[in-house]
């Protein structure tokens, strides 16, 4: 989903022969992921498997001359980016931005997903994958999209020719990023499952 400001910026860049590359990836598997627990904004670090997934991202991107790298304030995003950059990239402009952090699951945070779904399947479905229904005390995907869109509209105009951007994000913040760049529908955005270790690449 592009705002008019970002569309205008896109056409200016296009006609000036501008080309920047953006690589977006989800953090590696965490302890909460492994245990099927709603993480939200709570801190949960990478498992040994998650560490290997992050190293795998780094191996795939080691030849990219990254100029800026964005992370959220959550340890799983930071740890993943640290492993991606380690040994391959030096002097990178490293930026922490809370707008790309995971969705706040509110009262669901720390609960087991399987048990929560079993107790109330229909309500679970609404909380988990609907666009505009937020769990008690938490965020809807629509609310996450608003802050992620604000982030993208702030940072993209500052990219310069030949910039290479890394974004270490989360499953629910990647959703609106993909909608922004790929022009997908709301239903498609809400239905995607983002696999740890997968890289989404874009050129603007």
Regions found by a protein language model. Name each.
Residues 12-15:
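Short, positively charged and aromatic/hydrophobic N-terminal segments
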Residues 19-23:
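Extreme N-terminal starter segment of soluble prokaryotic enzymes
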Residues 29-83, 87, 135-149:
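Loop-to-helix element that buttresses phosphate recognition and phosphoryl-transfer chemistry
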Residues 34-37, 121-135:
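Short, basic/glycine-rich phosphate-binding loops at helix/coil junctions
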Residues 55-125, 181-195, 203:
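Phosphate-coordination/substrate-recognition cap region in phosphate-metabolizing enzymes
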Residues 78, 91, 149-204:
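Active-site-adjacent alpha-helix immediately C-terminal to a catalytic or transition-state-stabilizing loop
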């Amino acid at each position: 989903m592009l705002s008019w400001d970002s569309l205008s910026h896109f056409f200016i860049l296009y006609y000036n022969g501008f080309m920047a590359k953006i690589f977006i990836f989800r953090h590696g598997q965490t302890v909460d992921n492994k245990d099927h627990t709603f993480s939200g904004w709570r801190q949960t670090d990478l498992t040994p498997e998650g560490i290997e997934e992050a190293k795998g991202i780094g191996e795939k991107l080691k030849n990219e001359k990254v100029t800026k790298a964005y992370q959220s304030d959550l340890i799983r995003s930071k740890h993943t980016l640290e492993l991606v950059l380690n040994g391959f990239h030096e002097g990178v402009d490293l930026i922490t931005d809370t707008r790309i952090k995971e969705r706040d699951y509110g009262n669901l945070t720390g609960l087991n997903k399987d048990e929560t779904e079993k107790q109330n399947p229909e309500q679970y479905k609404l909380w988990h994958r609907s666009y505009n229904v937020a769990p008690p005390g938490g965020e809807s995907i629509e609310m996450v999209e608003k802050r992620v869109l604000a982030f993208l509209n702030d940072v993209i105009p500052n990219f310069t020719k030949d910039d290479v951007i890394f974004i270490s994000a989360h499953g629910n913040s990647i959703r609106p990023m993909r909608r922004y760049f790929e022009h997908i529908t709301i239903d498609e955005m809400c239905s995607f499952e983002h696999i740890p270790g997968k890289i989404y690449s874009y050129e603007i």
